[in-house]
C-alpha cells in the first residue's frame, strides 16, 4: 500500500523522502533535507534528525528532548515557501511553515532554516523565526492574515 510523503510533495513516500530518511541516499540540497527532516519528526525518527544536524551543534544531547516531544506532537503539514542555495558557497536556506497540534492546541513553526554542506552532505545548522504582526499576510501564501491562518 503506497502512502503520500508527509512532506507535502504529493509524491509517494517511498519515492520522495524515504531514501534519505532510511540512509539509502544523501539529500541533494537543503530543500530535500528540510523535507526529509520534517518526515523524521512525523515518523518520530530521532536518529535521522541527529544525523542530519551539523556535528558542531551537539544534537545528540537533545535526543531525550526530541523523543519526549514526539509523544505530545501531531504534525499536520509542511509548506515550503522559499529555498535558495549555491553549491559553491556550501550554504543554503529554506523558509517553511510546519503546522502541528500539541496539548490539544494547534500551532505553527515559521522558520528560515540554515544549512551547511560539508564533505558532500548537507546539514541543518539552525533557524531564525521571523516576527510577524497578527494582521500581516501569512508567509505560507494562503492570502489570509497570519492570525486567521498559521498564526492561530
Curated annotation (Swiss-Prot):
The signal sequence is: none
Entries under InterPro entries matching the protein: NTF2-like_dom_sf, SEC_C_motif, UPF0225, YchJ-like_M
A Pfam family this chain is assigned to:
YchJ_M-like
- State the family named in the UniProt similarity comment for this chain: Belongs to the UPF0225 family.
Q: Which HAMAP family match?
A: UPF0225
What is the protein's name according to its record? UPF0225 protein YchJ
Q: Which organism is it from?
A: Shigella dysenteriae serotype 1 (strain Sd197)
This protein's encoding gene: ychJ
Amino acid at each position: 500500500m503506497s502512502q503520500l510523503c508527509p512532506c507535502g510533495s504529493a509524491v509517494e513516500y517511498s519515492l520522495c523522502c524515504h531514501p534519505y530518511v532510511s540512509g539509502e541516499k544523501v539529500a541533494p540540497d537543503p530543500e530535500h533535507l528540510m523535507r526529509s527532516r520534517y518526515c523524521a519528526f512525523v515518523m518520530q525518527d530521532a536518529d535521522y534528525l541527529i544525523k542530519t544536524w551539523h556535528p558542531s551543534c551537539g544534537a545528540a544531547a537533545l535526543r531525550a528532548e526530541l523523543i519526549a516531544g514526539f509523544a505530545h506532537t501531531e504534525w499536520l503539514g509542511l509548506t515550503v515557501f522559499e529555498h535558495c542555495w549555491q553549491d559553491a558557497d556550501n550554504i543554503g536556506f529554506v523558509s517553511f511553515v510546519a503546522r502541528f497540534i500539541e496539548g490539544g492546541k494547534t500551532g505553527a513553526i515559521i522558520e528560515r532554516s540554515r544549512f551547511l554542506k560539508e564533505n558532500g552532505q548537507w546539514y541543518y545548522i539552525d533557524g531564525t523565526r521571523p516576527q510577524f504582526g497578527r494582521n500581516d499576510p501569512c508567509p505560507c501564501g494562503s492570502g489570509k492574515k497570519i492570525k486567521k491562518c498559521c498564526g492561530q
